[in-house]
Every structure is written in C-alpha cells, then in structure tokens.
C-alpha cells in the first residue's frame, strides 16, 4: 500500500519533470504550442468576455478604442475586438480541419501508392496533376462551383494540400517496407494489414505531424485570402480575411480595424510554423544540428 501511494504521489512530479525537460530541449514546441493553445482558449471563451460581433450601430461608426470597445468599431458600427476574437474561431477551425482532412486522405492514398505497384503510377500522376495547379486557383474554382461556405471551404483547401502529404507518406512507406524487420515479419507469416499497422504506419506519424502543421498554416492563410476576395467565408460571418477586406478603405481613420485581424493572423501562422519546426527538431534531431 505504501509503495502504491508513493508511486501515485510521485507521478505528477514525474510528469512535470517530463514537461520541463521537453521545454528545455525543444523550446519551439513550447512556444508555438503555448501561443496556439492560448488562441484556442480565447476563441472558445469569447462569449464570456466579448460582445456580439454581429450587432451593428450606425451611430457608432469608426469610433476610436474605448473602455467598452477595446479596438473601436468598424464602418458599420460593429465591435472590432469581438469580431477579431470570433474570427479566430473560423481561422482555427478551417486550418485544423483542413490539415486533418489532408493528413487522413494523404495517409490512406500514400500507403496505397507505396505498397501497390499497380496503382502507384496512376495515383502519383494524379497527384502531380493536382500539384501543378496553384492551391489558391484550385480553391477558387471549387468554391465558384458550389458557392461560399465553411464546409466546402475546408474541402477546397484540403484537396490541393493532399498531394504533398501523399508524396511524403509514399516516400516513407517505400523506405520502411524494404527494411529487414518488415521483411522478416512478412516471411514469418504476418499478414500485410498487421505489418502495415504495427511497423509501417507508426513510421509515418512523425513526418505526417510536421507536414500537417505546414498544411494548417497554409490553410489559415488561404482561408484569409479567399475571404478577402469574397469567395471564402460568407460575409456575414466574422473572419479575419473579411475584416481586412471590409476595412481597407478606412485604414487612415480606424487603423485597428485592419491591424487587429492582420496581427492575429500573423501571430497564428507564426505559432503554427514554430510548432511544426519544434516537432521536426523533436522527431529528427539531425535537422537541428544541420541548422
């Protein structure tokens, strides 16, 4: 009983020590992940401390920051601070879900391409064709056919990002499938699904996580760009791209209407990139030494 109690009481200290050790060895993971976690918490708790981002008051157009309106108001009298905070929800949702969709699709297609010589050439030629089309242009084409919407926006961003993930996973599968322990497992009678699950898929996770961070950052920027030109998030939904587009004519009068969403967009993308760099250094220490 005493031994069990000692272990139970020591476990939090062990976990704390592990977190501190990771923070010391990989500060980029702590910095990028901390900023991203803070942004997520602020976005989730927005109703607790900010106003309604949709309420318009024509008598409070383009007002300067005040105690009730921390970032002032836009050209329609809406609270810029509230719209900036709620806009974080859109950017984070689109970025994270686009990265997840691209990662899942790229993982499945990449494994098939890496292990099936029959479909490898067909799949990779299709991926090459998709990669030859600029992401922004392909997303605009898809959104033009369906109209604006968050769901279709996520799909439109994920599709052009999938080929890069597919090529990465395929290269890992081709490398791992020829290793002795994989061949030994197959010769020992292990079935292919079991070999994929136990030996090959775990090898794809670290590079897939790093690539997903890159996709997430790219998706956030793409969403902002598409919303800026009016084909992304519907105009009635608060979005950093919409805010910048609607306020660009009032930069001299109310600079915070552009600076607030622009700064949040830059910080979010920077945090995701820092997290991706930190994960790369964590999974591949040689990359850190080369730099």
UniProtKB/Swiss-Prot annotation:
The keyword Cell inner membrane applies. The chain crosses the membrane at residues 28-48, 92-112, 137-157, 213-233, 249-269. Residues 88-276 form the ABC transmembrane type-1 domain. GO terms for biological process: amino acid transport; transmembrane transport. One of its GO terms (cellular component) is plasma membrane. Probably part of the binding-protein-dependent transport system y4tOPQRS for a peptide. Probably responsible for the translocation of the substrate across the membrane. This is Probable peptide ABC transporter permease protein y4tQ. It comes from Sinorhizobium fredii (strain NBRC 101917 / NGR234).
